[in-house]
Swiss-Prot record:
Originating species: Burkholderia mallei (strain ATCC 23344)
Name the UniProt record assigns to this protein: Uridylate kinase
Coiled coil: none
Activity regulation: Inhibited by UTP.
Alphabetized Gene3D superfamilies for the sequence: Acetylglutamate kinase-like
CDD domains: AAK_UMPK-PyrH-Ec
EC identifiers of the protein: 2.7.4.22
Enzyme class: transferase
Gene behind this protein: pyrH
Length: 237
């Protein structure tokens, strides 16, 4: 079966790396994620990753109360760097070649973000992990995913979450909530569905870059999406 996508951008939240822990990085969880990523890479799909940092520090969280927002956001960017290095290390152990490119320079540890280099590495079959968000405060890693996905020519942004798609309401609070198989950007905005933050959402819509929302906890979901199966919710123009 030919793959439905040649190049994808996977958005992983920092919280997804915690597993059942209260904070930090759960090694078993990250190894399971890497096993799913390895399957996709071996199918021949080029894969880039944007990683969040909420498992370590979040600029808008309670721990940042009273702190200058820009300072808190820069701390969050450093948290994404830790997650990116952990992800790269787990990939190396799984036999996957991965590169970390950061929007903030830390040359002894990771490469700086250079778009042509990132594209070349993807074409060579390497996984490229984008760290430090956009490199600017006041922008989320969701926005970084929309930006990097647009820059490297990804065909879709795959947003891995704790639920298996976009629902009409919070399924944890409303048992009657229904999951959308697909929904347009305009409809999602009109219904105030929290797929991504507004800036990220608007960028994807303007660039006609679809978003596929799926559960990171569902085994094989990433592979099924790449092979064209109807997994989670597709948000489209």
């Amino acid at each position: 079966m030919p793959n439905a996508y040649k190049r994808v951008l996977l958005k992983l939240s920092g919280e997804a790396l915690m597993g059942d822990d209260a904070f930090g990085i759960n090694r078993a969880t990250i190894e399971r994620m890497v096993a799913d990523i390895a399957e996709v890479v071996r199918l021949g799909t080029q894969l880039a990753v944007v990683i969040g940092g909420g498992n370590i520090f979040r600029g808008v969280a309670g721990g940042a109360a009273g702190m200058d927002r820009a300072t808190a956001d820069y701390m969050g960017m450093l948290a994404t760097m830790m997650n990116a290095l952990a992800l790269q290390d787990a990939m190396r152990h799984a036999g996957i070649e991965a590169r970390v490119q950061s929007a903030l320079r830390m040359d002894q540890v990771v490469e700086p973000y250079i778009r042509p280099r990132a594209i070349r590495q993807l074409e060579e079959g390497k996984v490229v992990i984008f760290a430090a968000g956009t490199g600017n405060p006041f922008f989320t890693t969701d926005t970084a995913a929309a930006l990097r996905g647009s820059e490297v020519g990804a065909e879709v942004v795959l947003k891995a979450t704790k639920v298996d798609g976009v629902y009409s309401a919070d399924p944890k609070k409303d048992p009657s909530a229904t999951r959308y198989s697909s929904i347009s950007f305009d409809e999602a905005i009109g219904r105030n569905l929290q797929v991504m933050d507004a800036t990220a959402f608007a960028l994807c819509r303007d660039q006609k870059l679809p978003i596929r929302v799926f559960s990171i906890n569902k085994p094989g979901a990433l592979k099924r999406i790449v092979q064209g199966e109807d997994e989670g919710t597709l948000v489209h123009v």
